[in-house]
Structures are given as C-alpha cells and as structure tokens.
Amino acid sequence: MQDKEPLTKTEAAYWLLRRDILNTKLRPGAALKLSALRDAYGVGWTPLREALSRLEAEKLVTAISNRGFAVAPVSRTELEDLMRARMVVELPLLLESIEKGGPVWESAVVTAHYRLSRCKIVPDAASEEMADEWDEKHAAFHAALLSAATSSWLLRFQGTISDQLRRHHRFLGLAPTQRAAAGLTIGYETAVAALRDAMAIEHHAALMEAALDRDIDRARALMTEHIGYTLQVYIKSEDEDGELEPLKLRRGA
C-alpha cells in the first residue's frame, strides 16, 4: 500500500486553521493577522491567503474590506438560521435512515451511543481535550443515525451545517464561565443548567430508542426538540445586547 501524498502547504494551513476555528481556539470574530498566523503555524503568506480564501468560501472566515480576514462571528441570528437549515436537511435524512436502516445501521447507532455515553464531561468545567472528545463522539452519534440515508447532497449539506453548529456549541460552552469570570454572575446557574440539559445523554438515548423502534413520529418530535436545545442555551447565556461575550472582553479590556 502506498503512503498518502503529503499535504501541500496550502492544504496544511487550511486544515490547521479549520481545526482551530471549529474548536474556537481561534475565537469567533477574532482578527486573523497574517503575521501572527505565520508565526503560529509556520506557514508562508501565500498558503495562508489561499487557505483563508477557502475558509471564507465555507463561511468560517469573513473578509473585511482593507483589513484582511476575521473568524466568522457567532450570533443568535446565525444560530437560528442554522437551526432552520438543520431542520430542513437532517429530518428527512433521519426518517430515511429509520425506514431503510438494517442490522448494520442498528449496530452502528448503538455503538455510537455507547461511546457517547462513556464520554463524561462537565460542560462548564471541561478541558479542551474533554470538549474535543465529546464533540467527536457527539458528531459520530448523529452521523450514525443518518448513515442509512442515501442522498449524498443532503449528507454533504448536513456536514456543512454540523461544522458551523460545532463552533456555536463550543463557544456556548465557554460563555457562562467567561461571563462569571468577568463578574457577571447573574444568570450563570440558569445558563449552565441549559448547557447541561442540551448535552444530557438521556436525550440522545431517547432519540436512539425511537430510531431503533422505527417510531417515525416520536423520532421526528425528539429531533425537533433536540435541535432547539442550542438556541435555548444561547438565550440563557446572552447579555442585554444579545451577545455571549462580556463587553469588556469584546473590547479587549
């Protein structure tokens, strides 16, 4: 077997930047200065520009006139739009999977759920490694639920939506602790409770059981409810300006 061809410099820059945008190491709204990126990733100007242009096409990066690039912001409006898109794309995929899935699909769903259930995480006190693991297992569970669907285009759209939602999920996980650290403790417990509820294994177990029971109506209702959890976390985490980050942090104070 031949070894895989090494990544080009542009591909390497793209995947490194993409990873750090999705896990919010590069924070939503943050300026992406080429000099800082070059030092951080050891990649030259041209590969960085090409990688950033590619990420802009995926709406993970925004181009700012005469100012370069920035990480795409996280917002309630964007989240609501993503949720609508997820409803349109993911529900038909789930229902098709339930109708067409056989023993291999059932086994994949059960295995993915078991692995997610073994991923113990405290949402407001998770390390980056713990959050990465939960993200991976959570995405794998939802991918398993949809894996018997046959529409390659819908699955591609679902992957794009999932990546964008991952950024929102990760930033939402940071928001309550950030606000508390900035002295804004009002609403902290409510926000953390909503975050824990959204990540609870019980919701995922109910979704798995409905799918395996071929209960279309229950699966549809549970997935619709599940998709709405992220918005509830946002609503309970935002400040009076509708922002997740305290004003003093947004200003760099």
Question: Which residues does each PLM region occupy?
Answer:
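Short acidic/histidine-centered micro-motifs embedded in hydrophobic/aromatic stretches
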Residues: 111-112, 160-164, 222-226
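Short amphipathic alpha-helical segments with heptad-repeat character
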Residues: 80-83, 155, 220, 224
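A short secondary-structure junction motif
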Residues: 20, 24, 116-119, 123, ...
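Short, structured helix-loop boundary elements
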Residues: 7-10, 106-109, 131, 155, ...
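All-alpha effector-binding/dimerization core of bacterial HTH-type transcriptional repressors
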Residues: 73-149, 195, 199-212
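Short linear motifs at protein or domain termini
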Residues: 1-99, 236-244, 248-253
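Hydrophobic, amphipathic alpha-helical faces that serve as interaction scaffolds
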Residues: 85-101, 139-190
